[in-house]
Amino acid sequence: MNFSKNLPLLVSLWAITFFAYTHAATFDIVNQCTYTVWAAASPGGGRRLDQGQSWNINVAPGTTQARIWGRTNCNFDANGRGQCETGDCNGLLECQGYGRPPNTLAEFALNQPNNLDFVDISNVDGFNIPLEFSPTTNVCRRLVCNAPIVQQCPSELRTPGGCNNPCTVFNTNEYCCTNGPGSCGPTPLSRFFKERCPDAYSYPQDDPTSLFTCPAGTNYRVVFCP
């Protein structure tokens, strides 16, 4: 290789890699529902979004086990304390942890091996709001879970404002995969979710059809009621 001739290319490649690993990813969170959604993010906090409003958060590279979700039928006081019917996070407007099921999740891990982000929509914590999770440019797949799951929810999974995942209700290995890899598989109740939202996790070990990748450095859009 002629090093001097290829130096500009090498510098450009280094700059792209450096940017992906050192710059936060931006998440544009949008409420297109006809009702108010109290958006939540871990990390990130939380904010009330009326119809048509949006909220931008920046997430540091290398962040893992992160999620964004919506809360419904909330009531907070001037100090940001209260409660929500679904997705509540310890009674706080600005969440400091995960939400209480049921809640539809946009999950992600940024800047993982091979310069990839791992992204998914999950119904493992149940379903409360239709959700889209997509890149802001066409660099990877658009994920959507937009079925009338609350209205069609099986009776044993129904709860005010949402539809529980069977793991939440029964808390057994059959539904929660608590005995480790390969210890559980699809069930009739998990298939209820999968048939309506093929892109989304329906049980904890649903990785082959539910976990997707995007290039590190991608920015994202999360839409309630796409």
From Swiss-Prot:
The keyword Signal applies. It comes from the Eukaryota. Its EC number is 3.2.1.-. One of its GO terms (cellular component) is extracellular region. GO terms for molecular function: hydrolase activity. Expressed in fruits. PROSITE patterns: THAUMATIN_1 (PS00316), THAUMATIN_2 (PS51367). Gene3D superfamilies: Thaumatin. Keywords: Allergen, Disulfide bond, Hydrolase, Pathogenesis-related protein, Plant defense, Secreted, Signal. SMART domains: THN. Its main location: secreted. The keyword Secreted applies. Disulfide bonds join 33-225, 74-84, 89-95, 140-214, 145-197, 153-163, 167-176, 177-184. Residues 1-24 form the signal peptide. One of its GO terms (biological process) is defense response. It holds the Pfam family Thaumatin. It is found in: Secreted. Belongs to the thaumatin family. 3D-structure modeling suggests it may have endo-(1,3)-beta-glucanase activity. PANTHER family: OS03G0233200 PROTEIN (PTHR31048). This is Thaumatin-like protein.
